[in-house]
Amino acid sequence: PYFLVGKYNPKAKYQVSLIGKGVLFDTGGYSLKSPAGMETMKTDMSGAASAWGVINIVARTNQDIGLTVYTPIVENMVSGSAIRPGDVLKTRNGKTIEVMNTDAEGRLIMSDALAYAAETNPDLICDIATLTGASVVALGLDIGATFSNNNDLEKKFIECAKSIKEEFHPLPLFDGYRKLIDSDLADMKNTGGRFGGAITAALLLKEFIGENDWIHLDIAGPARSDNRKGATGFGVLSLYEFFKNLD
């Protein structure tokens, strides 16, 4: 595993932290995917790739904001040192997570990255990830999901995305579902059952953002749409358009 950090314009007045999920290949671990389910899993690092794409464009166009990118880089494989169902992990901010399903690994690596970013108290934390199949069930292959604790910023992001012809739709960050990830052994568990999976994943991430404004982008569908060959780069231009209009 690696944890890559990149900084642009760290002395700017407005500072943004951008976290990208970087699972280079996802077998599901001991909660093993089917062979068909693994076919596109080399694109499970689309969030990390997008994050680096965004900072590249921001730097090349000399934007006034400060941007720090954090990308945890792993593979989710079966091995003698792999995490197991039932393991309890202690995260960077001290909270503990019971692993119920090793195929819900993205939120585990992103929890530490979010906590690390939150320690710097940026003006805004964004994350982008191929996080849940539930978001694909809800929105299909062409629409990304947004979750946020700041409705005004979320609305502005969605408008910026529409202006460059990418579609995002807000999903509810419904605190009533927090109980679905309660654990008897830890502060939370990494899955919340069959229903509302995109929401419970977002609620887990919310545990690691501190008091910061935050937008979570779940791009599991459009990042690897069947409508074109390979990964799509979905979200890069939306984030760039959004960041250049922040103040």
Regions found by a protein language model. Give the residues of each.
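A generic structural signal for tightly packed, nonpolar segments enriched in small/aliphatic residues
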Residues: 1-247
